[in-house]
């Protein structure tokens, strides 16, 4: 093979500079000719739909042909003295370099020195080559096949043109020319046969750098550039600097059509595909500013509502799982920004200032944690307790099902209190409730902060209206991810009350259980919106709704009632006095489960129940149940009892109401149709020691109730029942269990290990066909 070239008339560099930057038909320098033993022609490269991955490096054969200027140099460059060298070439941002700089590639080849890139093919030889025209010669690259040759060709063309665009757009002179070049750059990226993230990101980064270095552009120039790069944003996130530019445009021109026509699909893509705003916070900020810009339109929140509807979709289930978490993240960050002025300034932060003055003596503040409520010293705590005896104190009663914040006065019974450690961090609700000044203080936000707060709280309301989003929304808001200043702000808690009400009205346990605290020692929405809580602005209607839904689910437990008796007995009695049916039921259960030991308090509860028709009716039913219970628990009757198969809860209730079962020790309900509802009857059997629930529909709710009342149970068979870890964990309170059958249940290995550690008398365990097997 003999390929030579000569530099004929005309300066090829001048020709290159005068050609359009994105010319698709690039011809070689004038006068260049290829000489050899066989004719050589330029290969006509047609993509025909082929796609290629952008090369960053690869192995290829290299040959450099210098343009002969003398007869001797022409002999030296003849085909007899020419050789091919293998090199591992790297396509850097500004040059083509070899991993082993030697021979032909001892020096890297700058993209600015490459005048032309063309594919070559020979008729009589299966060679696949590229010709790189450089000053004074030609660089030939030989690939193994035509696909690799084309891949190298497109990759080199891309690197070369991107390098030139970076130089051209780094020093703009006339903006109409710059805009034309940007459009051409975008077209090049869209029509490139290369597939790589950088194909679209590189032009965006070039434009982003251009905008960051030229801040004196007019509004019209801003919009023209945004429209020009819009096609690239359809499938790509904007770079950080470009996000900042978009944010500025949203703030300065919220009514611009660019916001609706260009930014809407960009924000939709961000909400659908973004996985972590922590890695790209400017995307979140851009989304926030876009939503605020929509809110500034004439229709205001109606436009925002339509946008949320478009994100959810027309069906009952949103097909994009990332939309809700991303929207919530945007709302939380926006709400935090509303109180940022208070948070960053002690003097202008009445919430923190008043909390410190009311709860603690002045103490040093950690400079790295300006929002942290510091741990009080034991001496300061004792001094405060001496100075304010009647002050409310915080006590936590915790269970595996529910954690309720208990407030006690100095006259409450010490038997029901549980002390917290002196080294624990002050409870948020205590801090907001302990000082009278905190209850009357008001936080005033500026006009812009007020609009931001109202807009994003309204979005949370809209999100809570979607049934499929409500479980995830409740889970995300369960830890109360709002600043302390927001919880002290009456406007915020009043607006957010709608969201909490939606949670309280949802019958799904996964939703309304999120009203409770996320773990022991922390506060939940149940505490904030209960009477006496910092966010309670009514007479307990929301509190009654929350208690009603929790009692109707699986929280009708002695621990839950004990917590209410300790914490909210007064509000419960007041609401029952006003005819609230749920509160009347609560008071009856307190009497039935012997939660209240004080006789005077019991008489007061009875008087409260008898003061209303609904309460009187429930109390009469309670008295009837108590008489039946005494008859049921009267000594006598069988010691063993087996119900026929297919028996139901009603059959069991009818049987137990027919006589005395005070001696019943062994009850078999195997292969019956009983459910968790029968637990209310089983807990009335005082002598029960063995219970067989094999192949029944007895579930977690019933298991939790049994664990609280039948603490003397010794043998329990749960084989082939639908119980899960949520119910099985409650068995840890049955210290007398000797035999436990959990065959074919949804028992996990961790729960099994936990039960073994907490049940010291357990000797026989069946965990076959479970995860723990």
UniProtKB/Swiss-Prot annotation:
Keywords, sorted A to Z: Cytoplasm, Leucine-rich repeat, Nucleus, Phosphoprotein, Repeat
GO cellular component, one term: cytosol
Residue numbers spanned by region Disordered: 1-28
Main location as per UniProt: nucleus
InterPro entries found in the cross-reference section: CMIP, LRR_dom_sf, PH_CMIP
Segments forming domain PH: 54-163
Protein name in UniProt: C-Maf-inducing protein
